[in-house]
Amino acid sequence: MATAKELSASSNVDNTVVGPSILISGRLTGDEDLTVRGRVEGELTLSRTLIVEPSGVVKANVAVKNAIVSGVVVGNINATESVELTREGRMVGDIRAPRVIIVDGASFRGRVDMGDVEPGRLPAERPAVVRPTAVTRPTATPARPTIPAARPMPPPPPSRPTPPPPPARPSAPPAVTRPSAPITRPGLGGLGSKPLPPPPPTRVERAEPQAGQAGSAEPPTPVLVGAGAKKKVVVKKKTR
């Protein structure tokens, strides 16, 4: 396949150029190379190569042998050999070609169809890349933080001292009993008062012995009389 430089060098012989100030609208066909520096709209069919310069704009469905896009293409490109998008190329559409080159920096939005694989030209199997096994490093288990000791409970607030009970009021002194005044008898004149005589002693009566006990030899029980009392004896005569 011819590169872009080779196509541009050979295009000096049979090459048609659409200048920057030219606008072609409609259907365009030809059997030679076409370089677009202006604007082409419609449908483009060539048996040779289409070259879109950085200043060129093509808004058409293109059917060519080779296509080199350095400008802007809006439409589908169907090439029998190759399609190349350079670094300055911008394309929106689908590409159908057996070989497609998209250089780093190009902008493309669409689908690419490179056809069926020819028999006898199966893609060579890529050698298996041996990737180094990742070395597993022992993961150090982080030590668990020690649980801080429980904070000591604050001491209870001091209890307020119980106020002492109020002092007991002193009880009133007992009333002093004054001795009663001596009773003076009326009619005694200037004589001094005399104390009253003591009350008479209690009269004690001796129980009489029963008839069956008259002849007993026990002497009668003497009667005790308090000191200062007069002794009074009562004698009863037995009636026969």
Curated annotation (Swiss-Prot):
Entry keyword set: Chromosome partition, Cytoplasm, Cytoskeleton
Pfam families: Bactofilin (PF04519)
Region (Interacts with PadC): 116-240
Changes seen on gene knockout: BacO forms single filaments from one pole, mislocalization of ParA and of ParB-parS complexes, nucleoids are more compact. PadC is found throughout the cell. In a triple bacN-bacO-bacP deletion ParA, ParB-parS and PadC are also mislocalized, nucleoids are more compact, DNA origin regions are mislocalized, DNA content increases. The triple bacNOP deletion is synthetically lethal with smc or double scpAB deletions.
Segments of skewed composition (Pro residues): 151-173
Keyword Translocase: no
Biased composition, class Low complexity, residue ranges: 126-150
PANTHER family: HYPOTHETICAL CYTOSOLIC PROTEIN (PTHR35024), POLYMER-FORMING CYTOSKELETAL PROTEIN (PTHR35024:SF4)
Official protein name in the record: Bactofilin BacP
Organism whose genome encodes this protein: Myxococcus xanthus (strain DK1622)
Gene field: bacP
